[in-house]
Amino acid sequence: MNTLVNILFIMIPLLFSVAYLVYFERKVIGAIQLRHGPSVVGPFGLLQPFADAIKLLVKEPIIPFRANTILFIMAPMLTFILALIVWAVIPFGAEVITENGQQIVIPKVIANVNIGVLYVLAISSLGIYGIIVAGWSSNSNYAFLGSIRSAAQMISYEVSMGLIVATVVITTGTLNLGEMVATKHSMPFWIDLLMMPIGVVFFISLLAETNRHPFDLPEAEAELVSGYNVEYSSMPFALFFLGEYANMILGSAMMTIFFLGGWYPPLKLSLLYKIPGLIWFVLKIVLLLFIFVWTRATIPRYRYDQLMRLGWKVFLPISVLWVILISGVLLFTGNLPGRGL
């Protein structure tokens, strides 16, 4: 029963967050482009997400004549479900208890598993199947080309992201996300500074992994009309849409855990520790989401060859170099996990 309550406690706010992330994005881009953004439905346009949801609910779901109906319907469901189940291992805070004179950190999470990092990477990589199936089952050249682009893009950047995550694991000595945050909090400050450049690479890779601007080539309007979801309408289209924005929030949460200290305040000041850890965690995610939106409004789209070159010829060598550099520095200074940290 407690597990069910915890799931609802996370899923309901997450779904509302996804809905209002769309509103937040439209408002921010409107302000950057000197427009009002949503302002008609409800005060300040706050009811716009509900109006959009009702519109999509009452529209007729159209299935192309030559489409594979079962796979066509399952693809958006797969994408959306995978975007949600990853949150089972994401910690939102921690409770510190003292046992036998030692402080033990207990993360506030649905499933406190010791391989949380591997779980996140595994489930995230499965998201590509929903996109590939959507493009193939639509029997549309535009949709299929968009899905192929998305597959190549996500696979290319997952290599760099995996190496960057390996760097974080080497630094902390654990695959448990809650323990990772607690370990990083107790590390010397210079290690965090050394990790910041690779954190920037990780965030840019997130933009490509989530098919966000300036790497939204799978749905480049000028070339592919709308990409892999061009044949979708009504709620199947909405599920793709919700899955994309849920992955944005998930990526921001992972960036927060790996590089921004999780639920701990940015500075080790006693006054800042009076603010609940959940608030710090949410504030950091909101800041990263703002950068997601800001990037969309200000940076032009990359060409496909530029995207591939950036992933394989720039980010991959940097990631490999940083794994070697971090390992060597930690070993030389005696800060490897289990060697005096």
From Swiss-Prot:
Record bears the keyword Translocase: yes
Residues annotated as transmembrane: 38-58, 70-90, 115-135, 161-181, 187-207, 239-259, 275-295, 314-334
Catalytic activity line of the entry: a quinone + NADH + 5 H(+)(in) = a quinol + NAD(+) + 4 H(+)(out)
Any one Gene Ontology molecular-function term assigned to this protein's record: quinone binding
An individual GO BP term: aerobic respiration
Top EC class for this record: translocase
Enzyme Commission numbers on file: 7.1.1.-
Compartments reported by the entry: Cell membrane
DNA-binding as UniProt keyword: no
Topological category with respect to the lipid bilayer: Multi-pass membrane protein
Cellular component, GO, one term: plasma membrane
Keywords for this protein: Cell membrane, Membrane, NAD, Quinone, Translocase, Transmembrane, Transmembrane helix, Ubiquinone
Described function: NDH-1 shuttles electrons from NADH, via FMN and iron-sulfur (Fe-S) centers, to quinones in the respiratory chain. The immediate electron acceptor for the enzyme in this species is believed to be ubiquinone. Couples the redox reaction to proton translocation (for every two electrons transferred, four hydrogen ions are translocated across the cytoplasmic membrane), and thus conserves the redox energy in a proton gradient. This subunit may bind ubiquinone.
Description of how the protein assembles with itself and partners: NDH-1 is composed of 14 different subunits. Subunits NuoA, H, J, K, L, M, N constitute the membrane sector of the complex.
Entries under HAMAP family matching the protein: NDH1_NuoH
Family (UniProt): Belongs to the complex I subunit 1 family.
Family matches, as NCBIfam families: PRK06076.1-2 (NF004741), PRK06076.1-6 (NF004745)
Name of the protein: NADH-quinone oxidoreductase subunit H
Phylogenetic classification of the source organism: Bacteria, Pseudomonadati, Pseudomonadota, Alphaproteobacteria, Rickettsiales
